[in-house]
Swiss-Prot record:
Leader sequence segment: 1-22
Subcellular location: Secreted
Originating organism: Lycosa singoriensis (Wolf spider)
The organism's place on the tree of life at top rank: Eukaryota
GO cellular component: extracellular region
The protein's name: U19-lycotoxin-Ls1a
Family label: Belongs to the neurotoxin 02 (plectoxin) family. 05 (U19-lycotoxin) subfamily.
Propeptide stretches in the record: 23-34
Location (main, coarse): secreted
Cystines in this chain: C36-C50, C43-C55, C49-C66, C57-C64
Expression across tissues: Expressed by the venom gland.
Sample GO molecular function, one term: ion channel inhibitor activity
Keyword field: Disulfide bond, Knottin, Secreted, Signal, Toxin
Domain text: The presence of a 'disulfide through disulfide knot' structurally defines this protein as a knottin.
């Protein structure tokens, strides 16, 4: 491949990577404005968990906290 084509592919890849990162940051900002709870934070019927995380409560329906999904735990394990 010519150097111009390689440079073009590199630039397109870089732009795609930056756009994906910006989208993640934007979604985090939207969720924080919406008032959702992050991982291991308190939750209730009025205070939902962010990113579709489950709200897990104790047996007497108190001390509810947002738990990470299996996908998040799996991803963190392999990023170490």
């Amino acid at each position: 491949m010519s150097p111009k084509v390689q440079a073009l592919i590199f630039i397109v890849g870089l732009i795609t990577l930056l756009a994906a990162h910006a989208q993640e940051e934007l979604s985090d900002n939207i969720e924080s404005e919406r008032g959702c709870s992050g991982a291991y934070k308190r939750c209730s019927s009025s205070q939902r968990c962010c990113e579709g995380r489950p709200c897990v409560c104790s047996a007497i329906n108190s001390n509810c906290k947002c738990r990470k999904t299996y996908t998040e735990l799996f991803k963190e394990y392999f990023e170490k």
